[in-house]
Each structure stands twice: as structure tokens, then as C-alpha cells.
Amino acid sequence: MGFPRASGILLHISSLPSEFGIGDFGPASYLFIDYLKSAGQKYWQILPIGPPGYGNSPYNCLSAFAGNTAFISPKLLAAEGLLPKSFAKPRADGIAAAAAARIETIRPAFEIFKQTSNEQLKAEFRRFCDENGFWLEDYALYQVIKSRSGQAAWINWEAGLRDRDEGALAAVRRNEEDAIEREKFFQFIFFRQWDALRRYAAENGVGIIGDVPLYVAHDSADVWASPRNFKLNEDGTPRVVAGVPPDYFSKTGQRWGNPIYEWEKMRDEGFGWWIMRLHFNLRLFDAVRIDHFIGFTRAWEVPGTDKTAENGRWAAVPGRELFYALGQALGGLKFIAEDLGDVTPEVEALRDDFGLPGMRVLQFGFGGDAGNIHLPHNYVQNTVVYTGTHDNETAVGWRMARRKGGGAGALKHCLKYLDSDGRQIHRDFIRAVYASAGNLAIVPMQDVLGLDNRARMNLPGTIGGNWEWRCKPGDFSGKTAKALRELSELFGR
């Protein structure tokens, strides 16, 4: 799939302005779509919207299908009569506390729903449960057991539940029927609010780009419900986990800890789980960015008991067969290949043979020679180009860091290349990617606003302080919208 020549903004749902401490699908999300339209932007890119697990990372979710119920808007629930007009509005510091407070705020909606006379809403709920039973039943059960087990990982549950003994699961279904139904209800509300938001975006000419991580967390409903899809020991512990080998930046490599797929079994079964997963996501989004695309050619398998990634080994992945099966089943591959990192000829061939646009990041272009693929004069049309991603510094922060510390050569190269004095480096970055040949240019909202690294979304390899940044109510201004629209028109986006 290729994109038309266009531009868009990267802003996660949690980063929308909110009086509750975390963004949601409420009025601010509709206001942002209005802003995108007025700014001449055709796309809104977000991060994964699943329920986050360890570290609150959206890339480490408890399910490959479920939604993060902290994104449910209390205001929209109240407007439907599913919360009192004067619902509680607790304030919380930090995204984890804000998410927990949000879930408590919306909890009464389930009891109100059970008493409602709105038969149409009840019918919608039943239809949602029927259509999504292939993941919803296991996810609701997983969440209820996890809650009653003190949030312990499934590997630490009592043996009968851990190993999915039918008698043990039947007892939970019988004793926790109401709690299971509540989990299903809030998933119903999540996707109902999301569908309404996406319809509004489409009506205003804005496409939404989602994000799918390659791997799932070990402590997830997917691994618990379908252990045969993963390389696990008899007791459910991972035989091997994902990571990357030692390199210049890390002498011991990186041990991510995600279980590795049983690719051979998945291939023998026609890649059914992958087809379901990506079909599900393409119902939610206009296109999907696939994280760690290079992992579809080979995986660095680290022994599950090792503390570092030093003793890993490369294992082949049948990516070509997978994408052929996806193309046959889905009728089109509306994907962006996140092909950053150690890109081998095999990765390039897989990307190009299936016509997938890759990624280029302007920040990575400076400090080397003119052949750097991240410099705009080297971009090709079937590419999505960024000033930076959620893992990068902001443009302003990038300049400040190189003025104060190392990287002076990269900054000098940057300023010369962009013919810039650096005072409005974020605008220079935006202009450079807009002017490039890459069909789709995406700019993080932090760069639109010219913010420094205090607004950085994520610092890879660290825990704490990430995923916290949020827009302020006045950030969707006519001034920045006008500037973006003028650039979009100037460069035919």
C-alpha cells in the first residue's frame, strides 16, 4: 500500500488535553480532529491503544485485541445517561494514577447499564459480545482472575487457573459472572466510543494510523489463552525471549523479555492468529504501522533464564509466507513498515516486494555523509518521513542537547544542511520533511508546538517518567494550524 502525498500529526490518545490527567475519546479528541482539518492535515497517527502492562508502555499490552478502558470518556458516558451528570472528577498525578482514577470514575456505568430500559443499547452490547467472542471471552476471564489474584502475572496463578483446567475456569465463570460481564461491557463502551470518533474523523477527511507491536507481553491474555502459539516450557515460562544482540551501544545486548512465536506451528495453521489480529486492527484504523518490522525476517532468541541477551542466536522467521497469507486474506496490506535499526537486505526485500512504505527519521540524518538514508534528498516516494518519533527527542530538545553536550558535529551538519540558524529548528525540521519526496510526512505534536525534551514521550531502555506528556487546552491554536496549512499547500500535501 502506498499513501497519497499528504501530511499528518503524531499524538497519542493519552496526550490529548484533559482535566482528568489522561486524554480520552471525549470532546478534546473531536477538537483535535477539527484542528487537523483546519491545519490541512490528512492523517492522525497514534500509538497502540491496548491495555498497558508493566511500565505503562502502550507497546507492552495485556492483550493484542482489547482496548485501554482508561481512554473511555466519562463526559460521553454522562451524556448517554450511563453516568450521573455530576460524576466524580478525581485529580491524579502521573499517567498510572490517572488511569486508575479514570477506571474508578466510570465503574458505576455498568450498574446503570444493567438497569437501563434502552433495549437498543443492550442489543448492541450482545452483538458486540457475539462478534468479538474469539478474544473477548478469554480477555474478560483473564482480567477477572488477575484482579482476584492481586494483579499477579498468570504464570503465578494457582495451577488449575494457570494451566486452564476446565473445572477451575468453569468455577470462575460461575462465581464471577457479574465481574466478567463488567469487563465485557467496558470493552464494548471503549470500541463504541472509538468507532464514533473514527466516523467523525472520516467525515472530516482525516485518516487514523494505528500501531501494532510485533511481540506481545508474556503476561497477556493472548499467551495465557493460546500458549501453543509461543515457545514456552511445560510450566508456561518462556523457553526463549526476544531481544537484540550486543552492539556498540550495549555490550550485553537488549533482553526485551517477550515470548517468541512458534512460527512453524503458526505457518502450518495458515497464520490464522496473525490474520485475525491484523484484520481486527484494519477495522479500527485506516492504516497500521507495524513496529519492529525487521523481526519478520529473523528473531534474536535469548534463553529464557538468561539475564542478558549475550547468549542469544538468530532464528529465521517466515515473514514472506506470512505477508503473502495476509495479502490473500485481507485483500490489501495497509501497513507501514517500521524498518529502523539493523536493516538487512532481507528486510529491504520483504518490505519492497510487498510494496510497503518504510520509515525515515530526520533526526537520524545528521553527523554522517551525504549518503545517509535519513537525509531528505535520499527519500523515495513510498516512504513515511518523520521529524522524530515517540522514541526520539523533540526537535528543539535535540538541538539543545547537542549545544550543551556531545554531537556538535551533527548539529553543525544539520544547520548547514537546513540553511538554518537553529532558533526555529522545529519549523526547519517540519519544512524539510514536507518538502521531501516522501509521500507521507508525520510530525509529532511536540514539534508542531516547538517544545523541548521535557515533552519527550519515551526514552527507550528506561522505566519511569515515560508516556506522561499531555497537551494543554490551548495548544490546538489557529496560529499553528495556519502555519501547517500553508506548508502543506506549498509542498502539495
Each language-model region and where it sits:
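Catalytic domains of carbohydrate-active enzymes, especially glycoside hydrolases
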Residues: G2, P27-P52, L284-F285, V433
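Surface-exposed amphipathic alpha-helices with a cationic face
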Residues: K37, W194-A202, G327, R351-D352
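Short acidic catalytic loops
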Residues: W44-P48, A201, G207-P213, N281-G295
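N-terminal catalytic cores of NTP/NDP-binding nucleotidyl/phosphoryl-transfer enzymes
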Residues: G8-I33
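Alpha-amylase-like alpha-glycosidases and glucanotransferases acting on alpha-linked glucans and related
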Residues: G2-R5, L10-H12, S18, N56-F191, ...
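Terminal-tail/helix-coil boundary detector
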Residues: W469, P473-R493
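Conserved, well-ordered alpha-helix/loop/beta-strand core segments that scaffold catalytic motifs
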Residues: E183-V216
